Amino acid sequence: MKIGICSLGCKVNIYEAEFVANILKENNYEIVDFEDKADIYIINTCSVTNESDKKSRKMINRARKNNKDAIIIVMGCYSQLNADKIDADIILGNKDKSNIVKLIEEYKTKNNKITKIYDLTKTKFEEMEISKFTNHTRAFVKIQDGCNAFCSYCIIPYTRGRVRSKDKTSVIKEVTKLVNNGYKEIVLTGIHTGRYGIDINTTLEELLKELVEIPNIYRIRLSSIEINEITPGIIKLLKENKVMAKHLHIPLQSGSNKILNLMNRRYNKEEFKNMITKIKEIPNISLTTDLIVGFPNETEEDFKETLDTLNEIKFTKIHTFPYSRRNGTPAAAMENQVPPEVKKDRVHKIIKLSDKDEEEFYKSNIGKTYDGVVEVHPNGEVIVHTSNYIPVIVEDNLENNTIVNVKITSVDKKKVYGNLTNK
């Protein structure tokens, strides 16, 4: 049978969709493009914003249009919260994805709708392992699920449950397999990656110290980490161990202490900036961030404070989102919601700043030489991905997933160009 898979949202969803595809292939199902006519469609949904909900519904409807007789399977964050609103044959939340083959066979036998939604505050980490990724030069490893932070705007603790960590030995085993299968860059991902280990008596720092010692490992990248979870030991590893990618994605969310407090972010801008100063002692480090604008009660003065904070820090790139009101979160009930047109204007201002800072960072690297992983795009464009997250375009014909040295020669409108070198 042919199966089309669509995965929306974060890197954890990418990992889980890849895992599902792998076990289906192992059981003789054929994976086809989601837009093709298939016998089964799987939509791995996202619910981080209202826009994500809308896109999840859109893809469910598209699957029905592609083949009205197909089996429709909906899983993930949107279905965890909205199972009763979904027209599908099999509905899973954020558990039981590893049982996908069994559930499909059960549906084919009984032809009865299956809904599996669990209380995620009472579940353990669902073990998954991937040894090969489709169409990726980088390999993702999900080391953790769930979140205990309860930021006032965020629905994710309700869709993903509490922090649950993958056993450290299992992580090391999975990463070792991927390295032995030729993957040069391993991206550690999770819903709240920095809290890895709090439920199994270990830490992210301890895990990293063991992972960098795996034979032949080239690069480990952290997908995201909170500022108050960056330990002196992690900074030391980043500074001294070449296996650690010289890039961190650290969500700021706001540069105003008033707004950070309303968001329940557990740090102030001074603490954030102090830690950034320490991190910037790492040569050539690249720092990216997430930012929410138009949070309830955010005045022009608060927004200006955020702009000032961003100008002081100078991130390589700022991923900006207008605040999205999520029912069931404390922020949704707050007074002084910001009008959409104000949010839109603030988003544009942040994008403009981000574009400027990104280009400045790239230009500051002209003349520098880095080693990196080659990625050959379907259109033939060859990109070398450096440790500090610079995508360098080269004119050479290179083999995918190889390691080369590249000297950055020029930057044009955020496009970085370089030449191969023997260093």
Whereabouts are the PLM-identified features?
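Proteins enriched for Cys/Gly/acidic motifs involved in redox and nucleic-acid/cofactor modification
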Residues: M1-G194, G233, M244, L248, ...
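Generic beta-strand/beta-sheet core signal
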Residues: C6, T189-I191, S223-I225, P251-Q253, ...
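Conserved SAM/AdoMet-binding glycine-rich loop
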Residues: I72-G76, L81-N82, I86, N180-E300, ...
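Glycine-centered loop/turn positions within well-structured domains
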Residues: S98, A149, G194, N228, ...
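Short flexible coil/turn linkers enriched for glycine and charged/polar residues
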Residues: T134-H136, C147-N148, M244, S254, ...
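Aromatic/acidic polysaccharide-binding cleft in carbohydrate-active enzymes
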Residues: P322-N336
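Terminal RNA-binding accessory module
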Residues: A333-K423
